[in-house]
């Protein structure tokens, strides 16, 4: 009886340990959700363009016949819902407005684009570009990425002087945009001041002089 009682107590102890371990494990807070950034959105958009994603209404980056596809707002959602290259995005991983118009309506920071005036387009990676019924992504250097034509690939082209009439830019509320300091985008260095990357200028920072070209890319340092 003594042996059996000892075994029973041991079983209770082990069970309690496992349960406590489980409870303790469950009590550990999950890692904070990845911060979504304007630079990250721009990198994601370029990836979609370079990988040949297709247009499919209602999609947000799912694989179809071995190729990912989205519609215009789905391209934005695919970044917010991204879980990696080996799986489909997870809908509602981040709460976001559904359509291009509702995305615009949800934005608190926005402005008008005049295609004859490049100064009306802020130098900010990851801005959302809007035209009635359509959205795209600004990736800097006067370039946009968007998905608009059934069966065709993601598009890449000029904003000012391009063949698509963008009317409005806005900041997506779910995305954090650069304010000050260096950022790396597509393998190049940019320097932000007061919320925009600098162009056609030099800056001396911590004793080092950096030169930035007309697209904002750091071209030299000494």
Positions of PLM-derived features:
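Bacterial Sec-dependent N-terminal signal peptides
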Residues: 1-10
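Bacterial N-terminal signal peptides
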Residues: 10-22
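Sec-dependent signal peptide cleavage junction
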Residues: 20-37
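Extracellular adhesion/carbohydrate-binding repeat motifs centered on closely spaced tryptophans
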Residues: 24, 33, 105, 119-120, ...
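N-terminal capping segments
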Residues: 32-88, 131-134, 145-147
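...with weaker cross-activation on analogous glycine-rich loops/strands in unrelated enzymes
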Residues: 35, 39, 77, 85-156
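Short, well-structured beta-strand/strand-turn elements
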Residues: 83-96, 173-178, 216
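A recurrent domain-boundary module in secreted/ectodomain proteins
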Residues: 162-178
């Amino acid at each position: 009886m003594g042996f059996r009682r000892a075994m029973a107590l041991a079983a209770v102890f082990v069970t309690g340990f496992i349960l406590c371990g489980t409870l303790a494990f469950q009590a550990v807070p999950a890692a904070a959700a990845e911060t979504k950034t304007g630079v990250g959105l721009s990198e994601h958009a370029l990836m979609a363009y370079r990988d040949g994603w297709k247009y499919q209404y209602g999609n947000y980056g799912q694989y179809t016949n071995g190729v990912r596809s989205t519609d215009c707002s789905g391209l934005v959602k695919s970044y917010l819902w991204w879980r990696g290259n080996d799986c489909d995005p997870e809908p509602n991983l981040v709460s976001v407005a559904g359509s291009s118009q509702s995305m615009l309506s949800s934005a608190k920071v926005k402005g008008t684009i005049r295609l004859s005036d490049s100064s009306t387009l802020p130098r900010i990676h990851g801005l959302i570009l809007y035209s009635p019924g359509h959205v795209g992504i600004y990736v800097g250097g006067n370039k946009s990425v968007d998905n608009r034509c059934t069966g065709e690939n993601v598009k890449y082209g000029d904003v000012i002087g391009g063949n698509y009439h963008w009317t409005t830019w806005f900041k997506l509320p779910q995305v954090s945009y650069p304010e000050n300091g260096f950022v790396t985008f597509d393998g190049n260095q940019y320097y932000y001041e007061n919320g925009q990357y600098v162009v056609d200028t030099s800056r001396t920072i911590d004793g080092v002089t950096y030169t930035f070209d007309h697209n904002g890319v750091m071209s030299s340092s000494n």
